[in-house]
Amino acid sequence: MPRNPKSFRLAARNIFLTYPQCDIPKDEALQMLQTLSWSVVKPTYIRVAREEHSDGFPHLHCLIQLSGKSNIKDARFFDITHPRRSANFHPNIQAAKDTNAVKNYITKDGDYCESGQYKVSGGTKANKDDVYHNAVNAGCVEEALAIIRAGDPKTFIVSYHNVRANIERLFTKAPEPWAPPFQLSSFTNVPDEMSSWADDYFGRSAAARAERPISIIVEGDSRTGKTMWARALGPHNYLSGHLDFNSKVFSNNAEYNVIDDIAPHYLKLKHWKELIGAQRDWQSNCKYGKPVQIKGGIPSIVLCNPGEGSSYISFLNKEENASLRAWTTKNAKFITLEAPLYQSTAQDC
């Protein structure tokens, strides 16, 4: 039996409305809610979301936050009328006990509009699970932190750095896969030895490749196209300037490594033999980083410029590196570029 309108009373700061089978555009519905006959207590935030319901009709869900506790006694207070036809809509009305949960629920389809400044609620202190559930489902890092601050202030203060680090990790987006700006076919001046190396390795299936493939060390002036050529060959790890085996930038599923402008004396101190020698199943030991297990078994394309401190050939020709030179010549081919790898002036890296 319907509730007697005279017995209706809504005393709440946060209100959750659902208008079933309501086809009023969400932005127009928001304006209608803003212009209701509010008394002293007025909306500080409104979010209106459209849901395509299973019954084939759109529903509107609304979250309203007020400047104070309401005292609404008119059951028809939230009724709205379609702006272009004579159709009235009456909502289901509830107090929103957990505004974060309501906010996340009504916008699960992503079709919403809003007005005002949302006030974060962390849920009840007695139920920390709700706090962290709401934080995980927040829209951004700062919103998640605000939820935890409100709902679990002790943990927020005592373990702030850990809490922030964990939240930032959860909200970190995977980097976009690198796309070469130039097609491999645009490199028309590649030395035969480089082309043969690439054809031999990439022309085989993974199962048919050598257990430890040969790497190549390519030395040439800047803007000869060596970086763009190396990066256009296939899925790879790009190590530039220093070694970083963080899982965000280094993948054990890559087909080869590109080692670009990493000083030879630095690589000698780190993982020269592991990377150039295509060694398998080894562990990184880079300073300031946690040890990482590397699958390996893939070749490296080492790119360098001529000159002291940059040239791998000059570095290996030093007397103190004689044994390393002997090892490297068995595990890598050396190529010196005499001209750019392309004919036009488009590629300059």
From Swiss-Prot:
Cofactor binding mode and count: Divalent metal cations, possibly Mg(2+) or Mn(2+).
Keywords, in A-Z order: ATP-binding, Covalent protein-DNA linkage, DNA replication, DNA-binding, Endonuclease, Helicase, Host nucleus, Host-virus interaction, Hydrolase, Metal-binding, Multifunctional enzyme, Nuclease, Nucleotide-binding, Nucleotidyltransferase, Transferase
Region: Oligomerization, residue numbers: 154-174
Keyword flag Transmembrane helix: no
PROSITE patterns tied to this protein: CRESS_DNA_REP (PS52020)
Motif residue range(s): RCR-3: 105-108
Region listing for Binding to RBR1, in residue ranges: 141-151
DNA-binding keyword on record: yes
Single Gene Ontology BP annotation: DNA replication
Binding site for a divalent metal cation: 51, 59, 61, 109
Record-annotated CRESS-DNA virus Rep endonuclease domain positions: 9-118
Motif position, RCR-2: 59-61
Any Pfam family hit: Gemini_AL1
Localization, UniProt: Host nucleus
Motif window: RCR-1: 16-19
UniProt free text on domains: There are 3 rolling circle replication (RCR) motifs. RCR-2 is probably involved in metal coordination. RCR-3 is required for phosphodiester bond cleavage for initiation of RCR.
Subunit relationships: Homooligomer. Interacts with the replication enhancer protein (REn). Interacts with host retinoblastoma-related protein 1 (RBR1), and may thereby induce the transcription of host replicative enzymes even if the cell is not dividing anymore. Interacts with host PCNA. Interacts with host SCE1 protein.
Protein name as annotated: Replication-associated protein
Record organism: Cabbage leaf curl virus (isolate Jamaica) (CaLCuV)
Record lineage: Viruses, Monodnaviria, Shotokuvirae, Cressdnaviricota, Repensiviricetes
